[in-house]
Amino acid sequence: MFLPKWSLVTVAALATCMQVRAQDEAAMQESIMVMEAYSGKVLVASNAAAKRPIASLTKIASGAVAVDWATATGTDISTARISVPQTVTLVGGPNPMNLQPGDQMTVRDALYAALLASDNLAALSVADHVGRELISRRGKSGDPVGEFVGEMNRLAKSLGMTQTRFANPHGLERPGAKAFSTAADVARLSVYAMRRNAFTFIVRQKERQITVHGASGPRNYTIRNSNELAGETGILGVKTGTTSAAGPCVSVCMERDPLVRTKPDGSKGATPRRLIVVVLNNPDRFSRARSLIRQGWAVYDPWLSAGAPVKDKRREIISVPDPS
């Protein structure tokens, strides 16, 4: 039986509409991913491949790029100063430190503000500074923030984050600037970032004193971590994020003491254990993360004791390279 052309068009259009609706419904649901960082073992996953905005979890990529730049160039982030650019006036939103164009702070203090308190202007200031350095070293010209965001996207590609696109260094939604990721991709990014000691040192702090140098002199601020799990036993980071489009989000890294086992030859071997938990769009994200941490360990330890069997590597293991 042959359908008229108009019927085929109608069927195709209906199928497209149904697909879009399914994608929209998936984006309205919670997305979660729980994995063990060293083995790459996926422990719990739900809606983990749904593309959606991730709000300030974007700053994990910003922080990783900044730390990688500092390592590659031998920059001491505790002493190197950055200037707040004129473009901060275009960001909008809260400005808790009253940052003004021309204000200065160290790279590390700016990263404390961006990664702990999720300060968008601090994130933009880091991006502007590092972007200018990258442009200069590459003998190029252009928008420094755009250069920095390009570096974020290159990092994402190198990590296999195939469902991710960054549009800015802070994660705020902007008209015409489509940005998205998935719980699985954020987990990849979190594994990578938490391999960097300088990054980990920053995101595990509960609070930190920082100084902003302005026209009228230095101003001191206490920066507090927006991650409610910070300071709890074993918690190493990572980041929170919330916008109206993304909903409440969090990525958490937790570490346990290595598991020591006796080998057949009588020697002992230690297996490091580190969980990455990503929760996207859950109004009770911190309680959910705590529950998933318990669930993750309940799956991982028996799996490891059984010899870490893998039947389908593509589905069961997330391999995160270290391109740097």
Task: Give the location of each predicted region.
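Penicillin-recognizing serine hydrolase domain
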Residues: 25-31, 39, 128-323
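Active-site-adjacent loops and short helices of periplasmic peptidoglycan-processing enzymes
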Residues: 20-184, 194
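C-terminal end-of-chain detector
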Residues: 2, 323-324
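Bacterial N-terminal signal peptides that target proteins for export
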Residues: 1-7
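Bacterial N-terminal signal peptides
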Residues: 7-15
